Amino acid sequence: MLGSLLLLAPLAGAAVIGSRADTQQCPGYKASNVQENDRSLTADLTLAGKPCNTYGTDLHNLKLLVEYQTDERLHVKIYDAEERVYQVPEKVTPRVDSGDGSSKDSALKFEYEEEPFSFTVKRDDEVLFDSSAENLIFQSQYLKLRTWLPENPYLYGLGEHTDPLRLSTTNYTRTFWNRDAYGTSANSNLYGTHPVYYDHRGESGTHGVFLLNSNGMDVFIDKTADGKQYLEYNALGGIFDFYFFTGSNPKEASIEYSKIVGLPAMQSYWTFGLHQCRYGYRDVYQVAEVVYNYTKAGIPLETMWTDIDYMDRRRVFSLDPDRFPLEKMRELVGYLHDHDQHYIVMVDPAVSVSDNGAFNRGLEQDVFLKTQNGSLYKGAVWPGVTAYPDWFHPDIQDYWNSEFSTFFNAETGVDIDGLWIDMNEASNFCPDPCTDPERYSSENNLPPAPPPVRSSSPRPLPGFPADFQPSSASRSQKRIVKAKVGLEGRDLLNPPYKIRNEAGSLSNKTINTGIVHAGEGYAEYDTHNLYGTMMSSSSREAMQYRRPEVRPLVITRSTYAGAGRDVGHWLGDNFSKWEHYRISIAEGLAFASMFQVPMVGADVCGFAGNTTEELCARWASLGAFFTFYRNHNEIGNIGQEFYVWPTVAESARKAIDIRYRLLDYIYTSFYKQSQTGEPFLQPVFYLYPEDENTFSIDLQFFYGDAILVSPVPDKGLTSVDAYFPDDIFYDWYTGTPVRGHGANITLSNIDITHIPLHIRGGSIIPIRSSSAMTTTELREKSFQLIIAPGLDGTASGSLYLDDGDSLEQKATLEVEFEYRKGVLHIDGKFELHASLVESVTLLGQGKGGSRARREDGTKKTIQTNLELSKPTEIKLE
């Protein structure tokens, strides 16, 4: 079935738009028929007085379900008794098993008051959540619940945003309504929705609260007039579907969250190399020239990307026949593959409404969104008038698979290695109400005019094929009443309660929220925030359909909770400003550690506006210490490829040299997160959870457990005041010990091509003996081990290796390293042949043997030439 555009009147009895103050008079609910056992609790909730109908009609009868799912997780669900109210579909967010937990073993305790109904969640008698702050409201188009918080709480999460890592607790609003957020402005809703917050309470532990609800929502964090701290949910629909989870520290809490939304997808080895892109490469010759220039500059380029420039008039699944002809594109991709490099292009969701294959086939299969009268729902984006795929349509995956397998066919098409999906909030340039997308497209020059055609490259590109050298010469869908799909009679376009959407009305610059999707009949009003994540999962499946044996890399702009199961995320259309250089750290940390989307990074050097040599040099270093490392900028701005400026080129070479030597450390840690949820990129407080000085740090971070990154934060600076917790660290470059005492240390004379790095004591890091121009070449290099003893003189680390690409591995290497009392112990699973460990470097003071070589008295290196094939012990002192 297809979608329809419904203009529905509000439910009978609903009041006109009220105010937040009106809700304080609502009666709340009374609990009755309470049934309780060791594993669960159920109850009926009945409206406790006269309906207030503030932003819709109060629902009289609700249900309460409480499940002690595990010792660390509690599920609390409040929903309508008839189960007609919309709930997030299980196909989007698969539900975790109810588990075998019990109230007597659980670290979390549920308690309630019958009238007015409220509940608390406690951990060891400490109140974590207390909904008695105000009466519960459950209306047809408005849900409200407020919880008390402790004074001056340390809260994190509630993404996507570009605010500080630690959330403000005064007059702060987080709005969930995915939008095309050019410029990624602070204090506004951005591309993704992650309705989870973490509350870190130092020694007593960390807990999280995840609300499984995809409706538009405001979350307020503020104080009452008498100074009491609270957090308040205000949603446009859905139900209260809470998951409370706890850990003794923030890292454990993040692991618990991964058990709810799913573990992140493992990525291929090559994806951790350097990526280069730009919106505005004029033709295939310029793309080839960029590849050549990177090689000439000695800067390792792993993957070349192309934005929508490659398309014929910006139409998806098409090639510009003059600027990106098929035969030249196949030659370009062939060249990259022959040189162990990779290629990625962008695909947007919107399909041009014109005589083209992708549109005609989609129209024939009836997989696009439609209006109530059976006509095609149309918007306007880059190609002009567009149709939108309906990700709920039962045939959409077949359509998407077919388009991918045809256009990206290895034998006849553009054989891409990964995928970039954009504009999937979904974006619509045509303002609401978009009554004439044809006129809007015409008046706004959509699609934009392409650049002049060139018949060949303007200069020789040695090594490229001869062609790259300079030339010598109808039906409608009515709404069906089903369980958990949504109440009838709601105003899906202008709900009484107005969330603080930066774009204005719900439908402005996006798909009309009155659309009803195919299949079960979900409304866009309820599922808007799922559009990008549904495109993500369909695109991952389509990539896997054409290459079923390998891990598909898909990078998306729009996300919802759990998106990391399928995709990685880049942080959107930022600016080439120092402010955005800095905020990329906090935003990236939130995605990687708190939202379980670990493949993440910003547009290095900035997307919008002209970057500067200094900013780009610093950012080239910083970007190397994210998992996803891509230089990308906008059409019309100056070029910012790393080779453009000598200092930027040098900064990139130095940073990539370190990154590539660390690539197996990165790969090992990323694999661990894909298996257990243990974060790789981490805020400082994740490793020092009892040091309150670390709780607000978001300009330093840990690259895995072992490496502290302390970037220079601003223009013109050559020093940074870096915080060192009470621990031992070692300078990455010199091995010099740095004894932290829980205070800042000023690091001075930091060259523009340098980024301060310190190894955390207690770590063993496997590195490659040298860098390489590609990750394929890198995998042939031998290993070295760096041992950085902790304050107790011990250290540990691990190494995971596989073939680097396959979904199913035939053999792996999983090695554990331990150093204690002068002896290195190596144990594990040795199925896969690995390169030799040519040397072991021991940092810190110590007595060396006859094979030891000292450097400034701070480290010694022992040549080993050890084969990682069996358990081994090596005496180092």
UniProtKB/Swiss-Prot annotation:
The active site is at residues 422, 425, 573. Residues 432-476 are annotated as: Disordered. Glucosidase involved in the degradation of cellulosic biomass. Has both alpha- and beta-glucosidase activity. The lineage of its organism: Eukaryota, Fungi, Dikarya, Ascomycota, Pezizomycotina. Glycans are attached at residues 171, 293, 373, 508, 574, 610, 744. The gene is agdC. It is an enzyme of class 3 (hydrolase). Keywords: Carbohydrate metabolism, Cell wall biogenesis/degradation, Glycoprotein, Glycosidase, Hydrolase, Polysaccharide degradation, Secreted, Signal. This is Probable alpha/beta-glucosidase agdC.
